[in-house]
Structure formats: structure tokens, C-alpha cells
Amino acid sequence: GVDHFHDVHTMSHKDVAMLARSVELDIAVDLGGFTQNSRTEIFAMSAAPIQISYIGYLGTMGANYYDYLVADQTIIPEKNQKYYSEKIVYLPSYQVNDSKELPPEITFTRKELGLPEKGVIFCCFKLSTLF
């Protein structure tokens, strides 16, 4: 859980950085990096004493205002650390999911899901707000 939630999506980059400082945020984690609609400007203004890049962009941010980048040995082998401006924090798997802990087998019939008994079903599990 969290103690406080601030909806900042309509705030300017500067106002978000100032808010983060005013609430004495300890660590800011950038989940977007150099991707569409990211807000790296907030990190450039030092929103928190410790700033981390994780999951959304797997390359170096190449900026002195990012302290750490979270990865695994597959994403960034130790021999390649020299190409990153950030210190690398290694996890066993940089993704929060892994293939070692499989979910329990749950099966549904097409009828239970309101689907026709025959035919092809297309699915997209993409975040609809990505663009």
C-alpha cells in the first residue's frame, strides 16, 4: 500500500519534480525511459535523491541524473557495464514474472466464457493506454 497518492498526469514536469521534493521522496523510478509519453524531464530536475531506470527502456539513459538501472545478466552482462552511465542493479530476472513459478492449471470451456464452440479467437493483452 501507499500512504499518499498524487495524480500528476496534468501537472508540468517542473511541478511534479517540485512536488516530489516537497514530499521528500527518497527514490524515484522511471518506468518509461526514452519511450513515447515518458517524462524524463522530471528526473533531469532531480525529483529524488536516488533515481532509477527500470523495465520500460533497457538501454542506458546516458545521463548523470540516473543513479541505477535495474537489469539481469541476460539484459546486461557484467562485461557490458562499462557502456552504461548508471550503476547496474542485478535481479535474478528483471521482469517481475518468471517461468519457474507457473500459475496453477485453470481451464475454462468456451461456453463458460461466452464464446462460440468453433472458430478462431484473437486476443491482445497489451496495455491500451500505451500510445
Where are the model-predicted features located?
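Residue-level preference for short coil/turn positions at secondary-structure junctions
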Residues: A47, Y84, P116-K118
